[in-house]
Amino acid sequence: MYSLDWPRAYGIPNSIATFKSLPEDFQVNELFEGQFSGEGEHIVLKIEKRGLTTEEVVKSLARLINKPVKLISHAGLKDKQALTTQWLSVHAPGEIIDGIETLEAPGWRILECTRHNKKLKPGFLSGNHFIITLRNVSDESDLIHRIEQIKFKGVPNYFGEQRFGRDGGNLIKAEEILVQGRKVKDRFLKGMYFSAARSWLYNLILSRRVKESSWNLPLLGDVIQLVGSNSIFVNDKSMDEQLLQRIGEKDVSPASPLPGRSKNLVKGTALQIINDVYEEWSAWLDGLEKNGLEEAWRANILYAEQIEYRINQGTVELSFVLPAGAYATVVLRELVQY
């Protein structure tokens, strides 16, 4: 029912590669701007994990320090089949937890420990640094050509398939809540299902624009977002040369909605595309509004910055930085089949 094979901006890659044969083939390191305060109610821990989900590490840490899971916070979830570093915070006002800075358990260990005056939460990160190893690459020249292409043009900013759960399971749960009226008491799970539903509808709109080759063009009535910012404005021209130049300079991007209570910003051609996509999803839209979700906007274009690569006998190591909330897999799918 829920196909996650979204159209690609640059066609199906010629090159085929093996990805994630080892957790070390997918390395992710959190990036943030600024410094921790060094004091405050929250102990902040830099964790390295391998072959575990973020939730599994949080539960393991909670057991070792004898704290409820609800006192441990993070800025984002990290993949299980990967080697990742991320920050966790423990609410422990005025408390010293002996030996916490050297704690470790199978699959994870603590690298750094300090304090901060705020707990970690989504929005704290500026981005993530990825180091990806592709093995048995069948067509290195096609891969290199595509890397050079996306350096300047970016890729469609889809939500990755992990957003939707195994086999789209989060979307099935969202359908049960939004359409069938099922009650879910767990606020975290409910929020996760709603996020999946909104991400799905965003991807549908973006995929329509990829098919029509307009995902990176400013249509009449488009909401335009400043790159690296939540600031938006509406394009009131059919094809603005100045906007095209700013898009080429990676300054702005057309944006598509994460549905909720609408402020009716989008107009014209862009609105027509959105309405066409939404037509068969009215029950989901009504349900999201009734549950108090507010419309938000997400850039259509994702730029992978600081791209570097090394090639060694059929193995390619890629390194790049993405903003928080972006998915490395949507970059990879434009480069190789895996």
Swiss-Prot record:
Cellular component terms (Gene Ontology)? cytosol
Q: Which organism is it from?
A: Legionella pneumophila (strain Paris)
Which keywords accompany this UniProt record?
Isomerase, tRNA processing
Q: What is the lineage of its organism?
A: Bacteria, Pseudomonadati, Pseudomonadota, Gammaproteobacteria, Legionellales
Active-site residue list: D79 (nucleophile)
Describe its function: Responsible for synthesis of pseudouridine from uracil-13 in transfer RNAs.
Question: Which top class of enzyme applies to this chain?
Answer: isomerase
Task: Give this protein's Gene Ontology molecular function annotations.
Answer: RNA binding; tRNA pseudouridine(13) synthase activity
**GO terms of biological process kind:** tRNA pseudouridine synthesis
This one is known as tRNA pseudouridine synthase D
Q: Which Pfam families does the UniProt record give?
A: TruD
The enzyme's E.C. designation: 5.4.99.27
**Which top-level group of life is the source organism from?**
Bacteria
